[in-house]
Each structure stands twice: as C-alpha cells, then as structure tokens.
Swiss-Prot record:
Gene3D superfamilies: 3.40.50.12280
Subunit architecture: NDH-1 is composed of 13 different subunits. Subunits NuoB, CD, E, F, and G constitute the peripheral sector of the complex.
Protein name (database record): NADH-quinone oxidoreductase subunit B
Necessary cofactors: [4Fe-4S] cluster
Membrane topology according to the record: Peripheral membrane protein
Species for this entry: Pectobacterium atrosepticum (strain SCRI 1043 / ATCC BAA-672)
CC cofactor note: Binds 1 [4Fe-4S] cluster.
Length: 224
C-alpha cells in the first residue's frame, strides 16, 4: 500500500500548501524489518492505541456557509445520532477541534478567514469538504466564489451532493475514521521521523466501479 508522506517545512516554497510538502512513499511498516522485533512491535502497538483514541473521539469545528450546514446539523438529531461515532461535541473554538467541516459556498472574502481558523487548529487536524460548492464551487462559476476549498486547504474527505444528505456526512466520518486508523504520526518531537504517513484513500466512485458497471436494471427517476 502506498502512503502519502507530509512533511512540515515552515521555510519551504510551496504555492498551494506553504507549510507542507507531500510525496508518495512505500508502506512505513516495512522500515520495521530493519529494526529489532521488540521495538518494531512496541511502536506498532503505540500507533494503534493512539489512532484508536483519535478516530473514536473526533470533535468537529463546524464552519457552516449555506444549505449544506443544515444537512450536517441534522445528523446530530435523534434520528441519525452521530454520537455513535464520537463526533457529537461541536467546538466553538478551532483550538479545541480535531477536524473542520467546510459546508457550503466559500466566497473569496471568506477564504482567508477559513485558512486562518485552520491554522489555529492544533495537530493532528483534518478537513472535510461538504457539498458541491465546497468541493468545486458548484453552480457558482464566478469570480467571487472559490472553485473548491482545496485551493487553499488540504482536504481529506470530499462529500458530493447539492446538498448531501446527513447519511453522506456520517459516511464521510466513517471514511475519515478508517483513514486515521492507518496513519503513522510522530510519537514525539524527538522519537521517530517527523513526518505524517497517510494511506491513499480510494474514492467511492472507483471502489464501487465494478458494482456500478454490473447494474442492468436502472431505477426510474421517481425512485431515486
């Protein structure tokens, strides 16, 4: 499995993500082959324990911009009960949040505000882009709308739809939890390599490609 290694470089030159540099590397667990069995297993167990705590206690920092935010907060009702995934604690401060949900249309004047709030979040942190407007600008192909929040933020999970249903938001949480469980982050600022290994997430479109092609009886528009 290929992993994406993200290095923090404050002095690096990168137009898109000034504080990060990403590259595709091999599985970091292969490095344990050249080390002692005891230390390799111990470090692996520590990573699994830390990731278990992170993925089951995700506190969202909501940044609602339009109608997608209404669908997001619907998942907090008793019908959907997002508390099952440990992500029901909405934070009003970015310093107390684990991931940011950009739900809705991002205007050019709002982009610096979102980026500054993202920079105020403590590591580790993740970003979910919710809705067509946040993903690619949606139907607003105009100078005043940013054509996708990934123009200035590193997005981890994209949620398609206009607007997406609350079930789509909860599925994005599950995908994010699965990705966090496979991450390899520094256990300390003096222990191990100071980089973040993230498994490359396959899109749901590609993952279900065979299932989509195998469908012969398509549903009518009234049944969708």
């Amino acid at each position: 499995m290929d992993y994406t290694l993200t290095r923090i470089e404050p002095d690096g030159e990168n137009d898109r993500y000034p504080l990060q540099r990403q590259e595709i590397v091999s599985d970091p667990l292969e490095q344990h082959v050249h080390r002692s069995v005891y230390m390799g297993k111990l470090e692996h167990a520590l990573h699994d324990t830390v990731n278990w705590g992170r993925q089951n206690s995700l506190w969202p920092y909501n940044f609602g911009l339009s109608c997608c935010y209404v669908e997001m907060v619907t998942s907090f009702t008793a019908v959907h009960d997002v508390a099952r995934f440990g992500a029901e604690v909405l934070r009003a401060s970015p310093r107390q949040a684990d991931f940011m949900v950009v739900a809705g249309t991002c205007f050019t004047k709002m982009a610096p505000v979102i980026q500054r709030l993202y920079e105020q979040m403590l590591e580790p942190k993740w970003v979910i882009s919710m809705g067509a407007c946040a993903n690619s600008g949606g139907m607003y192909d105009i100078y005043s709308v940013v054509q996708g929040v990934d123009k200035f933020l590193p997005v981890d999970v994209y949620i398609p739809g206009c607007p997406p249903r609350p079930e789509a938001y909860m599925q994005a949480l599950l995908l994010l939890k699965e990705s966090i469980g496979k991450e390899r982050r520094p256990l300390s600022w003096v222990v191990g390599e100071q980089g973040v290994y993230r498994a490359n997430m396959q899109s749901e479109r590609e993952r279900k490609r065979g299932e989509r092609i195998a469908v012969t009886n398509l549903r009518s528009p009234d049944e969708i």
